[in-house]
């Protein structure tokens, strides 16, 4: 009996290791940038797939970071393939500057960075649609998920579909089956998304003391970031489905930690919102009583210091 159990244990370990081994492929070439993706497939003829975008402030990060691989395995176990992608990091242009850029120049760089990341998201999605049969992907069930800068990209990307931002890349009428954002926000230079009514369910995780990505909003004229507190208020008015995990007094660690500690909520979202089409609005307030309460308002300079250091 012990020998039989030992054999099963070895097979289980081998199975887990095999499931975690992705297939790497090129999904797009943009100028001198060759963009690759790691595809973590599941054993199914036509499975839903999550396009994942890593975090790193549009400056750094990796599609293959060990911070995410356990989460990818969890998604595989739930029957979802994962397409973890490279995307162009526009703020790496800061490396070549001898002087600190002006505010106007910084806004231009940030806008260009988000635009490039969103375009790369659309390109990755188009690749999946084109190769859906050979990759075993259900083209009607492609979701997007991101951490921090990646979360900004997926929220902004899905919002941009209704604004014809993907024209010429994705088929007319295409939409994602769902969005999962770990510490993200919509970034726009066209004014606030006052009538925010995403046509697919959205799940958001965010900490109220996050000084990297706005929990509420951070706007200067028509330029701004709009976080989940702002977005869910609009979604209440437009009756759009969402699941928001609101971490009181938590900082930017929410860009990663829920991938491990809040899988029950993610599984609920996938099963009920994505698979069953439930039209629910859930806000889950989470407070760690061992964590000091955050006092004071987070201002624009707090975001500047958190993302770019002392200016």
Question: Across the structure, where does each feature detected by a protein language model lie?
Answer:
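Short amphipathic alpha-helix adjacent to the substrate-entry channel of hydrolases
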Residues: 63-85, 92-94
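N-terminal cap/lid segment of alpha/beta-hydrolase-fold proteins
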Residues: 19-45
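Serine-hydrolase catalytic-loop signature spanning alpha/beta hydrolases and amidase-signature enzymes
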Residues: 57-60, 82, 127
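C-terminal catalytic histidine-bearing segment of alpha/beta-hydrolase fold enzymes
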Residues: 38, 236-311
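Alpha/beta-hydrolase active-site loop
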Residues: 100-134
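Short beta-strand element of the alpha/beta-hydrolase
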Residues: 46-57
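Primarily recognizes the serine-hydrolase "nucleophile elbow" in alpha/beta-hydrolase
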Residues: 124-198
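The feature captures the conserved acid-bearing segment of alpha/beta-hydrolase catalytic domains
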Residues: 167-239
């Amino acid at each position: 009996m012990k020998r039989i159990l030992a054999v099963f244990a070895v097979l289980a370990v081998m199975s887990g290791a095999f499931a975690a081994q992705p297939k790497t492929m090129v999904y797009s070439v943009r100028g001198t940038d060759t963009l690759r993706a790691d595809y973590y497939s599941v054993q199914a003829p036509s499975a839903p797939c999550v396009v994942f975008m890593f975090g790193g402030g549009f400056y750094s990060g990796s599609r293959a970071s060990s911070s995410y691989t356990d989460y990818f395995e969890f998604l595989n176990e739930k029957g979802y393939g994962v397409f973890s992608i490279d995307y162009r990091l526009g703020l790496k242009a800061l490396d070549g500057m001898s002087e600190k850029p002006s505010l106007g120049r910084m806004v231009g760089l940030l806008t260009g960075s988000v635009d490039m990341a969103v375009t790369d998201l659309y390109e990755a999605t188009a690749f999946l649609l084109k190769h859906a049969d050979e990759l075993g992907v259900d083209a009607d069930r492609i979701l997007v998920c991101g951490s921090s800068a990646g979360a900004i990209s997926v929220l902004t990307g899905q919002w941009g579909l209704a604004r014809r931002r993907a024209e010429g890349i994705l088929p007319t009428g295409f939409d994602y089956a769902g969005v999962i954002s770990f510490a993200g926000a919509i970034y726009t230079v066209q004014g606030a998304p006052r009538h925010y009514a995403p046509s697919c369910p959205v799940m958001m995780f965010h900490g109220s003391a996050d000084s990297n990505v706005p929990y509420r909003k951070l706007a200067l004229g028509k330029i701004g970031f709009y976080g989940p507190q702002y977005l869910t208020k609009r979604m209440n008015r437009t009756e759009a489905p969402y699941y928001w995990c609101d971490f009181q007094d938590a900082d930017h660690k929410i860009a990663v930690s829920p991938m491990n500690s809040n899988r029950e909520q993610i599984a609920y979202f996938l099963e009920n919102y994505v698979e069953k089409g439930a039209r629910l609005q859930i806000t889950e307030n989470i407070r760690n009583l061992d964590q000091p309460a955050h006092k004071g308002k987070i201002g624009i300079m707090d975001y500047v210091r958190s993302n770019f250091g002392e200016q």
